[in-house]
Swiss-Prot record:
Residues 1-61 form the TGS domain. Its main location: cytoplasm. Catalyzes the attachment of threonine to tRNA(Thr) in a two-step reaction: L-threonine is first activated by ATP to form Thr-AMP and then transferred to the acceptor end of tRNA(Thr). Also edits incorrectly charged L-seryl-tRNA(Thr). This is Threonine--tRNA ligase. Homodimer. Residues 242-533 are annotated as: Catalytic. Belongs to the class-II aminoacyl-tRNA synthetase family. Its cofactor is Zn(2+). It is found in: Cytoplasm. Its EC number is 6.1.1.3. Keywords: Aminoacyl-tRNA synthetase, ATP-binding, Cytoplasm, Ligase, Metal-binding, Nucleotide-binding, Protein biosynthesis, RNA-binding, tRNA-binding, Zinc. One of its GO terms (molecular function) is ATP binding. It comes from Coxiella burnetii (strain RSA 493 / Nine Mile phase I).
Length: 651
C-alpha cells in the first residue's frame, strides 16, 4: 500500500500500486489535466509511471522549470517524427534539450532548405493537433537492436551497442514513430502548443570531426504562445545586437582566416580596450594590488610541475625550441608564483596581491570560436592573492566589493552569485576545505547578497564563487570568479615563514572580474546595442558643419574639446547634414554637434545626444562641463532598452 507525500506536506495512501496520473486525478482535475510528468524523490518520471512503494511526489506542469524541459524534449521527438514522415530516407541520431530549446541531428542525402524547415514545422503542428498518445516501451538489448536495424537507423544501433549492458533500454512511441530515449515525455502530442524551428546548422556525429557531417535543426518550445512570442522577440533583438554586426557599423575590429580566434583591432575598438585597461588598472591599484608582467613563453617543465600540462594539455599551444619545449602562456597563475618565490616571505608580508593584464592563448576548437565571445588569443584581468588561511574571508570580501564596483561602473546591476563546493576528487584536508568554504560563504553573507550553492562543482584545488551577469535580454553571462587554491603554490615550492617560525605554503586566491577584456566588451556591446557609456565611447563627439563657412569654427571647437581630454572629431565633408548625422548615429557616436551660421555668430553649439531626436543650443564651456561630469561619473544617458518593447530607430 504506497504512501505518497505531497509538496504541501499532505499524505495520500493507496490500496494498490498507482500511476502518477492517477495520483494527480485524486488531487483534482485542475492538476491532472496539465500534468506533464512527476518528480519522485528528485527523479523525473512519466505520468504513466507506476508507484509501488512509499515516495515523495510532485506533479510537474508547464509552470515548473522541469515542465519546460519535458516539453522541449518531447518537441525534439516531434521534430524527428515530422522529418521521418516528410523524408523517410532521413536517419535520426540524437535530439537533446539545450538552453531555451532543443535540436535534432539528421543524416540525409541532401541539405535541408529553409523551405523544408517550414514544411517540417507545419507537419509538427499537424502531429501535435492529432493529439497522439506517447507511450513508453521497455526493450531488451536484442529487441532494441533488431527493431532499429529493421528501421535502417544505423546511428541508433551504434548508440545501443555503446550503452552498458546492465542499463534498461527504453523507447517512446507516438503513432507510427518510435525513438530510443530515457524520457520522460508529455503523455500526448497535443500538449505541445508553442514551438518554432529556428535554424539549420552542420554538426559532426558525436562531435568528432573524423565522423560524418550531419544536419542539425534547432528549435524552441514554450508553455504557451505568449512565452514563445516573447522569446522570439528576444531572439530577434539579440540578432540586432550581435557584437560582430555592431563592430562593422562602429568600425571596431575584424577577423581573418589567417589567424582564427585572434582579433584585428581597429583604432576605434582598441580605444575602448585601452579605456577598459586604464580603468581596471585604476581599480586594482585602489584595492591594493601591485601590477606585474610575466613572459609569454615559459618552459613546459613549469606547467608540468603546476599540473596544468596534464589537465589542459590538449588546450595548450606549445613550441619545440631545441633542446626545450616551450608553452605559450594559457594563464598567469604559475608565473605569479615565480614572482612570489623571489626572496623570503614572512606572514607579515601577507596578503600579497599581484595583478596582470595577462595575454593568454588557448587552443580552442575551430568550431567553438565565436566573435569576441570565444577566442584563442585574449587578455585577462588576471590577479592572484597570496595569503594565510585566516585571511581568505577578508580578501574574498574585499574582492566582492571591488567586483560590484566594477560591474556598476560598466552599467551592470544584476549579479548572480554561486558558491561551488568540494568535489569528490580533490587535494587538501577536509578541515582546510571546510574552513575555505565557510570563509567564502561568510564573505557572501556579509555582503547581503543572494547566492546559490553548487555542491561538488568546485575545482580539485579549492572552492570557488562564480559571478554572472544578467543582461537586458535575460541572458546569463558568467564573467567573474574567485577561486581558493591549496595545490599550485605547494606544487611550485611557494612558502612563507609563519609566526611560529615554520615554513607554510600560502593559500593562493585566483580572481578575475571581467574574465577577458574581449569577451566582456562583446557582452557590453550587446547589452548596450553599441550605445556605450560616454567614458568608453571611442569617439565621444563629432562636430559637423553645414557649409564651408563654418569650417574654422568647427576646427576651433574640436581643438578646444581635445585639449580638455574629450575624444572629439570633425566632419567637414561636402555632404548633406542629414547624411552625416545618420552616418554618425549608426556608428553610435554619443554626441553630435551641428554648426551653422547662427552658431558661429552666437558662439554656441547645436548639440544632439544619441538617444534624443531634438537638439539643444549650448555654449562650448557648458557643453564641455557636462561632458566632463558625465565621464567622471561613468554614467549612461539612460537605462538599457527593455526587452519587452521593440527598440525604435536604426539598429
Amino acid at each position: 500500500m504506497p504512501t505518497i507525500q505531497l509538496p504541501d506536506g499532505s499524505v495520500k495512501q493507496f490500496s494498490k500500486p498507482v500511476s502518477v496520473q492517477a495520483v494527480a486525478e485524486s488531487i483534482g482535475t485542475s492538476l491532472a489535466k496539465p500534468a506533464l510528468a512527476g518528480k519522485i524523490d528528485d527523479h523525473l518520471v512519466d505520468v504513466s509511471f507506476i508507484i509501488d512503494k512509499d515516495v515523495s511526489l510532485r506533479i510537474i506542469t508547464e509552470k515548473d522549470p522541469e515542465g519546460l524541459e519535458v516539453i522541449r524534449h518531447s518537441a525534439a521527438h516531434l521534430l524527428a517524427h515530422a522529418v521521418k514522415e516528410l523524408f523517410p530516407k532521413a536517419e535520426v541520431t540524437i535530439g537533446p534539450v539545450v538552453e531555451d530549446g532543443f535540436y535534432y541531428d539528421f543524416a540525409f542525402e541532401r541539405s535541408f532548405t529553409p523551405e523544408d524547415l517550414e514544411k517540417i514545422e507545419e507537419k509538427m503542428r499537424s502531429l501535435a493537433k492529432a493529439d497522439l498518445a506517447v507511450e513508453r516501451r521497455v526493450l531488451s538489448r536484442d529487441e532494441a537492436l533488431t527493431l532499429f536495424k529493421k528501421m535502417g537507423e544505423r546511428y541508433k544501433v551504434e548508440i545501443i551497442r555503446d550503452i552498458p549492458k546492465e542499463e534498461i533500454l527504453t523507447a517512446y512511441q507516438q503513432g507510427d514513430f518510435i525513438d530510443l530515449c530515457r524520457g520522460p515525455h508529455v503523455p500526448r502530442t497535443g500538449m505541445l502548443k508553442a514551438f518554432k524551428l529556428t535554424k539549420l546548422a552542420g554538426a559532426y556525429w558525436r562531435g568528432d570531426s573524423n565522423n560524418e557531417m550531419l544536419q542539425r535543426i534547432y528549435g524552441t518550445a514554450w508553455a504557451d504562445t505568449k512565452a514563445l512570442k516573447a522569446y522570439l522577440y528576444r531572439l530577434e533583438e539579440a540578432e540586432k545586437r550581435d557584437h560582430r554586426l555592431l563592430a562593422k557599423k562602429m568600425d571596431l575590429f575584424h577577423f581573418q582566416p589567417e589567424s582564427p580566434g585572434n582579433v584585428f583591432w581597429h583604432p576605434n575598438g582598441w580605444s575602448i580596450i585601452l579605456q577598459m585597461r586604464e580603468y581596471i588598472r585604476h581599480i586594482t591599484h585602489k584595492y591594493g594590488y601591485q601590477e606585474v608582467h610575466t613572459p609569454q613563453l615559459i618552459d613546459a617543465s613549469l606547467w608540468d610541475k603546476s599540473g596544468h600540462l596534464e589537465k589542459f594539455g590538449d588546450d595548450i599551444f606549445s613550441l619545440p625550441l631545441e633542446p626545450q619545449q616551450y608553452v605559450i602562456k594559457p594563464m598567469s597563475c604559475p608565473a605569479h608564483v615565480q614572482i612570489f618565490n623571489q626572496g623570503v616571505k614572512s606572514y607579515r608580508d601577507l596578503p600579497l596581491r599581484y595583478a596582470e593584464f595577462g595575454a593568454c592563448h588557448r587552443n580552442e576548437p575551430s568550431g567553438t570560436l565565436h566573435g569576441l565571445m570565444r577566442l584563442r588569443g585574449f587578455v585577462q584581468d588576471d590577479a592572484h592573492i597570496f595569503c594565510t588561511e585566516d585571511q581568505i574571508q577578508s580578501e574574498v570580501s574585499a574582492f566582492i566589493d571591488q567586483l560590484h564596483e566594477v560591474y556598476a561602473d560598466f552599467g551592470f546591476t544584476e549579479v548572480i552569485h554561486k558558491l561551488s563546493t568540494r568535489p569528490e576528487k580533490r587535494v587538501g584536508s577536509d578541515e582546510v576545505w571546510t574552513k575555505a568554504e565557510q570563509a567564502l560563504a561568510e564573505a557572501l553573507n556579509r555582503k547581503g547578497v543572494e547566492w546559490d550553492i553548487l555542491p561538488g562543482e568546485g575545482a580539485f584545488y579549492g572552492p570557488k564563487i562564480e559571478f554572472s551577469l544578467r543582461d537586458c535580454l535575460g541572458r546569463i553571462w558568467q564573467c567573474g570568479t574567485v577561486q581558493v587554491d591549496f595545490s599550485v603554490p605547494e606544487r611550485l615550492g611557494a612558502h612563507y615563514i609563519a609566526e611560529d617560525g615554520s615554513k607554510k605554503p600560502p593559500v593562493m586566491i585566483h580572481r578575475a572580474i571581467l574574465g577577458s577584456f574581449e569577451r566582456f566588451l562583446g557582452i557590453l556591446l550587446e547589452e548596450s546595442a553599441g550605445k556605450l557609456p560616454l567614458w568608453l565611447a571611442p569617439v565621444q563627439v563629432v562636430v559637423m558643419n553645414i557649409t564651408d563657412r563654418q569650417a574654422d569654427y568647427v576646427g576651433q571647437t574640436v581643438e578646444n574639446l581635445q585639449n580638455l581630454g574629450i575624444r572629439a572629431h570633425s566632419d567637414l565633408r561636402n555632404e548633406k547634414i542629414g547624411f552625416k548625422i545618420r552616418e554618425h548615429t549608426i556608428a553610435r557616436v554619443p554626441y553630435l554637434v551641428v554648426i551653422g551660421d547662427r552658431e558661429v555668430a552666437d558662439k554656441t553649439l547645436s548639440v544632439r545626444a544619441l538617444e534624443d531626436e531634438a537638439s539643444t543650443t549650448i555654449t562650448l564651456e557648458e557643453f564641455a562641463r557636462q561632458l566632463k561630469a558625465e565621464i567622471s561619473q561613468r554614467s549612461r544617458k539612460s537605462p538599457a532598452p527593455s526587452p519587452l518593447f521593440p527598440v525604435g530607430g536604426e539598429s
